[in-house]
């Protein structure tokens, strides 16, 4: 039988997207193959699985579906030793059946290499919307390494734009703390891409924490980053360069605090309350005086 993902392994057109038909082939051809029952304790997850976090609620939902309707599609495995099988496709089904405490599961056994197993696992998961941007980026990186492809060639074979692949891969340059925030869905991919502009890692992590704590949207984060990287005050704009008084440099964490205060005042103003502010920048401190009328003017 023709190997699944043969075009990814060098045969066929290198520009034709392979994801849809060959992934379907990888699981759908089970009608022509033998489905056997395997002891669930002999099955292990795929070591090439790009997904690092499984949604317990969705696994529970899948468990209820399987309990009611049974397993419509068997999992696909390969034999790795006398009493061990590695999952090629269907880990969510495996986890759901394990949750139901099944002792045996329906499976199709395939004879595949590490390279083929990894590719099927990676591409199967790339079809699913549940992957985080980091998991997707890791999958792209592994496929590039496995098949020694350029980003352009990988994008063509997956039917995606090269910029999509490049933008995802760029996320892997971020510190582990930022990547973990994406994996845990504390920030979005767009948040992470905005953070790339900050080259100073301690500052980058500080802004990350501020983003999570204040629940900033992408636009708010971009405004904060702009203010940090290119701080310009009204006073500085109106005073000629020669007349600028010498001030102590404002630390980056103070800038973040000031921007947060100003952002809060803007929100108060938008709610319909008139707010008067006075700002004073001295050698020792930065003072903001806020005046809120007790009575609304008629």
UniProtKB/Swiss-Prot annotation:
The lineage of its organism: Bacteria, Bacillati, Bacillota, Bacilli, Bacillales. Signal peptide: none annotated. Belongs to the ParB family. GO terms for molecular function: DNA binding. This is Nucleoid occlusion protein. Effects nucleoid occlusion by binding relatively nonspecifically to DNA and preventing the assembly of the division machinery in the vicinity of the nucleoid, especially under conditions that disturb the cell cycle. It helps to coordinate cell division and chromosome segregation by preventing the formation of the Z ring through the nucleoid, which would cause chromosome breakage. Residues 152-171 bind DNA. One of its GO terms (cellular component) is cytoplasm. It comes from Lysinibacillus sphaericus (strain C3-41). It comes from the Bacteria. Its main location: cytoplasm.
């Amino acid at each position: 039988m023709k190997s699944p993902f043969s075009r990814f392994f060098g045969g066929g057109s290198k520009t034709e997207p392979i994801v849809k038909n060959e992934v379907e082939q990888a699981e759908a051809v089970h009608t022509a193959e033998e489905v056997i029952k395997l002891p669930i304790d002999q099955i292990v997850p795929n070591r090439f699985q790009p997904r690092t976090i499984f949604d317990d609620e969705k696994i529970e939902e899948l468990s209820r579906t399987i309990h009611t309707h049974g397993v419509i599609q068997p999992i696909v495995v390969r034999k790795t030793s006398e009493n061990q099988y590695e999952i090629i496709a269907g880990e969510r089904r495996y986890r759901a059946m394990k949750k139901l405490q099944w002792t045996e599961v329906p499976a199709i056994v395939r004879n595949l290499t590490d390279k083929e197993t990894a590719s099927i696992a990676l591409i199967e998961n790339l079809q699913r919307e549940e992957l985080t941007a980091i998991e997707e980026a890791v999958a792209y990186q592994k496929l590039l390494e496995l098949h020694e492809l350029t980003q352009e060639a990988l994008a063509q074979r997956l039917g995606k734009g090269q910029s999509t692949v490049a933008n995802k891969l760029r996320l892997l340059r971020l510190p582990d703390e930022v990547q973990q925030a994406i994996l845990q869905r504390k920030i979005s991919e767009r948040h992470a891409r905005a953070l790339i502009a900050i080259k100073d890692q301690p500052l980058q992590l500080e802004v990350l924490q501020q983003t999570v704590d204040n629940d900033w949207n992408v636009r708010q984060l971009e405004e904060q980053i702009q203010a940090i990287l290119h701080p310009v005050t009204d006073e500085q704009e109106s005073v000629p360069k020669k007349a600028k008084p010498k001030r102590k440099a404002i630390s980056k964490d103070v800038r973040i605090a000031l921007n947060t205060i100003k952002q809060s005042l803007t929100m108060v103003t938008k709610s319909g309350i008139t707010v008067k502010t006075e700002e004073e920048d001295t050698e020792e401190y930065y003072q903001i005086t806020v005046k809120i009328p007790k009575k609304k003017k008629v």
